[in-house]
Amino acid sequence: MSIERKLAAIMFTDIAGYTESMSKSESKSLDTLEKKRSILKPLLKEYKGTFVKEIGDGTLSYFESAVNAATCAVKLQEATYDDKDMNIRVGIHIGDIVFKDGDVFGVV
């Protein structure tokens, strides 16, 4: 069985302080999460990113271009900069990924 590998830029995002925020106001925190989604999804499309999954307030996406990943990350942070409830953290790594069951794996 062959494994499909692909060189990609992986982008992780999360909202700093989200767990603490949930303990204070679930409704407000869920609204913040929905706002993040509404900003991120069009940016992924614009910069040719592929959304893989969401775990709580974190997301995992990948890009074929490191430049597109970095630009998307900057645009996400610019779009949320003035929102005190949405302190977005972004990590980008580059390396080979493996696809399995709609998910990606790798040491990136």
Give the location of each predicted region:
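Catalytic NTP-binding/metal-coordinating core of nucleotidyl cyclase/transferase enzymes
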Residues: 1-72, 79
